[in-house]
């Protein structure tokens, strides 16, 4: 984020699904560094807790009815082109993020025995590919929880697809550490079913705090092809 400040970035645009920690993290960081944040969000009758928390932390929401998050990603890119905002792709698939992640993993394990096997969930694949760069001799297991995996996203990880829909809770939720019950917990469940006792598990985040804003007061519903939130920007 400091690099973006140094580049003179005044506004970032990203996407925020109903569940996802990247938008929450960006909302907090943009607040800290006095950068405006715009988040393209899928239309719904009522925003989710994660989306509400982003708005509470200062993010400007733009709503559109979409079939899948790549459609929101396209709108975010168009918004950036029209407004000169700094576009960050879905999944934080950005060189600064990947480089920072590689350094964090490398530094953490440089004086430790490297894991033989590392489990994580996968959506866009940025996390597992980042760990694969930092830990080239580790075997990776990736549990898909949210979307169809595209070519190149998996890296060299062994692929698993969780047997329940994205918004459903995991069959097993960790009891000894905080873990989001419909996301990372699904990776934990499969580690316990198919992994070994010495396997490592990377959890993206614990449960986010509950937002304080009144969710029903946010007008988030849009019909198909209703892009009124974007018209003022020439989209």
PLM segments and residue spans:
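Positively charged, low-complexity intrinsically disordered leader regions
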Residues: 1-10
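Active-site-proximal loop->helix
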Residues: 3, 21-67, 133, 150-156
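Gly/Ser/Thr-rich loops at beta-strand to alpha-helix junctions
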Residues: 16-24, 44-45, 94, 120-131, ...
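Structural beta-sheet core signal
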Residues: 39, 120, 142, 201-203
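Small/polar-residue-rich loop-to-helix segments that shape phosphate-bearing ligand pockets
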Residues: 43-112, 155-179
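Internal active-site segments that recognize and position negatively charged phosphoryl groups
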Residues: 101-112, 117-129
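Active-site/ligand-binding loops adjacent to catalytic centers
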Residues: 137-195, 216-235
């Amino acid at each position: 984020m400091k690099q973006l400040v140094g580049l003179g970035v005044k506004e970032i645009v990203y996407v925020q699904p109903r569940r996802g920690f990247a938008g929450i993290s960006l909302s907090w960081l943009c607040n800290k560094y006095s950068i405006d944040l715009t988040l393209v969000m899928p239309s719904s009758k009522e925003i989710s807790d994660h989306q509400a928390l982003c708005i509470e932390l200062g993010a400007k929401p733009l709503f559109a009815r979409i079939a899948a998050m790549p459609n929101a990603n396209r709108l975010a890119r168009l918004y950036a082109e029209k407004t000169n905002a700094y576009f960050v792709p879905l999944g934080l698939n950005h060189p600064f993020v990947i480089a920072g992640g590689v350094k964090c993993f490398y530094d953490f394990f440089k004086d430790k025995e490297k894991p033989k096997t590392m489990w994580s969930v996968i959506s866009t694949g940025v996390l597992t590919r980042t760990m694969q760069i930092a830990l080239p001799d580790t075997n990776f297991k990736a549990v898909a929880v949210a979307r169809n995996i595209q070519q190149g996203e998996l890296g060299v990880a062994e692929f698993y697809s969780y047997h329940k829909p994205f918004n459903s809770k995991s069959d097993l939720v960790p009891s000894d550490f905080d873990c989001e019950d419909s996301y990372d917990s699904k990776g934990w469940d499969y580690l316990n079913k198919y992994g070994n006792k010495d396997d490592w598990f990377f959890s993206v985040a614990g449960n986010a705090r509950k937002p304080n804003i009144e969710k029903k007061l946010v007008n988030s519903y849009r019909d198909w092809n209703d892009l009124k939130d974007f018209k003022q920007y020439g989209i």
